[in-house]
A protein has these predicted regions:
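N-terminal targeting/export leaders
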Residues: 3-9, 18-130
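Eukaryotic membrane transport/trafficking proteins
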Residues: 13-15
Length: 130
C-alpha cells in the first residue's frame, strides 16, 4: 500500500512539474510595440511584434487605417535597414513578416530599435521603438 501511495504521489509531482515547465519552455521571448501615426497620416496605427525562441527569430509589422494608400506599396524599415515592402490591401492594411526558420533575414531587435513605415515616396506613416 505504501509503495502504491508513493508511486501515486510521485506521479502527481511529475505531472505538476511538467504542467508548469512546458508552458514556460514554450513561451517565446516576445515583445510587442504600438506604432504611432505621423502628422501626414493621423488616422493610421500599427504594431510590431518580435519573438525569439532558441535559434528562431520572427518579426511581424502591420500598419492599418491607411485606405487612401490602397493598392500602393509601403516600405518597412527596422533599425534603419530596409526590411521589405508590402502592398496596401482594400481594407487599408499592409503587413510584413520575417522568420529565420524559413531562411529569411530577421534583423537584430533590441531595446531602442526603431521601426518606421513609409510610403514609396518616403512620407512617414507610422513609427515606434522597441
Amino acid at each position: 500500500m505504501r509503495l502504491s501511495n508513493w508511486i501515486s504521489g510521485s506521479f502527481a509531482v511529475v505531472v505538476l512539474a511538467l504542467a508548469i515547465a512546458v508552458p514556460t519552455a514554450l513561451a517565446a521571448d516576445r515583445t510587442r510595440i504600438a506604432l504611432k501615426p505621423s502628422a501626414a497620416f493621423p488616422a493610421a496605427n500599427g504594431k510590431a511584434t518580435f519573438k525569439a525562441r532558441g535559434g528562431e527569430r520572427e518579426l511581424q509589422i502591420e500598419v492599418e487605417d491607411i485606405r487612401r494608400l490602397r493598392g500602393k506599396r509601403v516600405v518597412f524599415r527596422v533599425g534603419g535597414v530596409l526590411l521589405g515592402t508590402a502592398r496596401v490591401n482594400a481594407f487599408g492594411t499592409a503587413r510584413i513578416e520575417r522568420n529565420s526558420d524559413r531562411g529569411q533575414r530577421v534583423p537584430a531587435v533590441r531595446a531602442g530599435t526603431k521601426v518606421k513605415v513609409r510610403t514609396a515616396a518616403g512620407v512617414l506613416i507610422v513609427s515606434g521603438s522597441f
